[in-house]
Amino acid sequence: MALAIGLCLGLGIPISLIIGAVIGYYFAGKYFKKQLKENPPITESQIRAMYQQMGRKPTEKQIKQIMATFKKNNK
């Protein structure tokens, strides 16, 4: 009887920890990707400011091109 309880605890706890870690990793990755999509690491205004600091006036095409590159790399 005591052996059966010890065996159940000895196998049940590590298996449930592994399953919990896998599920947590999956949902954390999904949440992180959602946050990146909603709040990109750089915005169009930041790109404009970066160009102005370099002494250049960016065209709308350049800004859209840079944003498309960021979105492509985040997928």
UniProtKB/Swiss-Prot annotation:
It is found in: Membrane. Keywords: Membrane, Transmembrane, Transmembrane helix. It is a single-pass membrane protein. Pfam families: UPF0154 (PF03672). InterPro entries: UPF0154 (IPR005359). One of its GO terms (cellular component) is membrane. The chain crosses the membrane at residues 5-27. It comes from the Bacteria. Belongs to the UPF0154 family. HAMAP family: UPF0154. This is UPF0154 protein MYPE400. It comes from Malacoplasma penetrans (strain HF-2).
